[in-house]
Amino acid sequence: MSGSSRVWVEHVTVRPDRIVADIRIADEACVLTSEDMIDKALCRYPHLLDHACVNDWGETFGAVASRTSVAHLVEHMAIEGQARVSSGAKSLFVGKTSWANRAKLLARVEISYEDDLVALASLRAAVLFADYLLAEREEARFCVGEAPLKTEKRNGNESAGCFRIPYNG
């Protein structure tokens, strides 16, 4: 963990069929996603809302995206990251997110893979991006009264604009 991270991988196990990662959340304020986070995530992971997802609100990740755990968002971003570079058009990746210890803000994310190195890189990128999104949200909370973020119209709705962040991969 770096000194100011809000989410990080605490432990990873590579199994023959999946990666199991323990994801630590820094504090309770960082546990859940928000609509703004999802809008920004869609710039990098445009198919997130269409992922099949077992949940209490619908059949896709979109049904819960703006009110789910950040660890669950990491799962879906890591899966989409793998799908992007997958060797087969019919590749199917599955994942599961659960709380290993909710009181200690420790989640367990499991994702299947074709190539373990691609899966690990996708997981790393997803965690770094989730941390960036949480930092943006935190900064927005502390900068009340400053100039608003640039917005754009998408499907008739105003949303945060797409952006680039430096990647030191």
Describe each PLM feature range.
Residues 42-47, 91, 130-135:
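Short, surface-exposed linear patches
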